[in-house]
Amino acid sequence: MSGWGMPRPVFIVSDHTGLTAENIARALLTHFPGQPLRYLRRPFTSDAQAAQAVVSEVEALAASGERPLIFTTTTQPDVLEALQTAPAQVFDLLTENLRLLEGEFAEPPQLGAGGHHDMQDSEAYLSRMEALDFALATDDGIGDKQYGLSDVILVGVSRAGKTPTSLFLALQHGIRASNYPLAEDDFEREGLPAPLEQYRSKLFGLTIDPRRLHAIRTQRKPGSKYASIEQCEYEVRRASALFARLGLPVKDTTSASVEEIAAGVLALLRQSGRLEG
C-alpha cells in the first residue's frame, strides 16, 4: 500500500497501444495478490516531451508519499532516458531481452521494423474498445435488441459478478459480452425471460453462494428485502433450477476471481467454435 492508504500506482507506458506492456505487467503482478494496485495507462508515449509529461505525473505522486511502478515496452532511447529519471521503479520490458536476442541471432534488432505488429496491436486495441462499448451498451439487461451481436450473454441474479466479467472479457479478450440480471418476475415462468429466448446457445449462467450474495448486497442496501438472506437463498435456488432445466453451462463465482470466471466463458466459446485459439 502506498501513501495515504491508496493503492499503489502502476504506470503502463508504451509508444503504441500499451496492450503488451499491460499484459506483461499484470502477469507479473498477479503473483502479489495482497498488493492493492491501480493502473494508469499512458499509450502513444513516443517522444521525450510525452515521456516528460509522464515523469511529471510520477513526481507529483511521489511528492504525496507514493512510489509508483512504471512498466514500459518503448524502444525509443529518449523516452527510456526520461522515464529512468522518474522517482519510481522502472521495468524496461524489452531492452535486455532484445540485447540477448541480438547475441543469439548475431545481428542487431530493427527497432523500426514493427509496422505489421504495430498495426495488429492497434487493431486489437480498437477491437477491445469496441467490445467495451458493446458491453456497456448491453449491461444489466439494457440493449437487449443487440443480443444477436453478442458472443456470450452472462445470466445470473443481481450481484453475482456479471458486469465485472463482461468488462474483463471485453478489455482483455475483445469479447462482446452482454449480461442479463434474473429478477423475481423471471422466476414466475418456466422458460427463459423473453429477451433471451432466441439466444439460448449464447447463455452462460453465473451462480453464487447465498451467504456471500447476502454479504455483498448488504453492503449496497443494508436492511432491505433485496439483501435479506431469505431473498438471496430464494433467488439463487430458482436461478440454479432454471440453469439445470435448460442445461446451461454454469460457473460458481463465490470464491472465483474475474479471471477464473472469464476462463470458463472462453473455454465454452472455444468448444462451440465461436473463438479460435
Curated annotation (Swiss-Prot):
Catalyzed reactions per annotation: [pyruvate, water dikinase] + ADP = [pyruvate, water dikinase]-phosphate + AMP + H(+); [pyruvate, water dikinase]-phosphate + phosphate + H(+) = [pyruvate, water dikinase] + diphosphate
Pfam families: Kinase-PPPase
InterPro entries: Kinase-pyrophosphorylase, PSRP
Listed GO MF terms: ADP binding; ATP binding; phosphotransferase activity, phosphate group as acceptor; protein serine/threonine kinase activity
EC id: 2.7.11.33, 2.7.4.28
Family: Belongs to the pyruvate, phosphate/water dikinase regulatory protein family. PSRP subfamily.
Biological function: Bifunctional serine/threonine kinase and phosphorylase involved in the regulation of the phosphoenolpyruvate synthase (PEPS) by catalyzing its phosphorylation/dephosphorylation.
Listed name of the protein: Putative phosphoenolpyruvate synthase regulatory protein
Annotated organism of origin: Deinococcus radiodurans (strain ATCC 13939 / DSM 20539 / JCM 16871 / CCUG 27074 / LMG 4051 / NBRC 15346 / NCIMB 9279 / VKM B-1422 / R1)
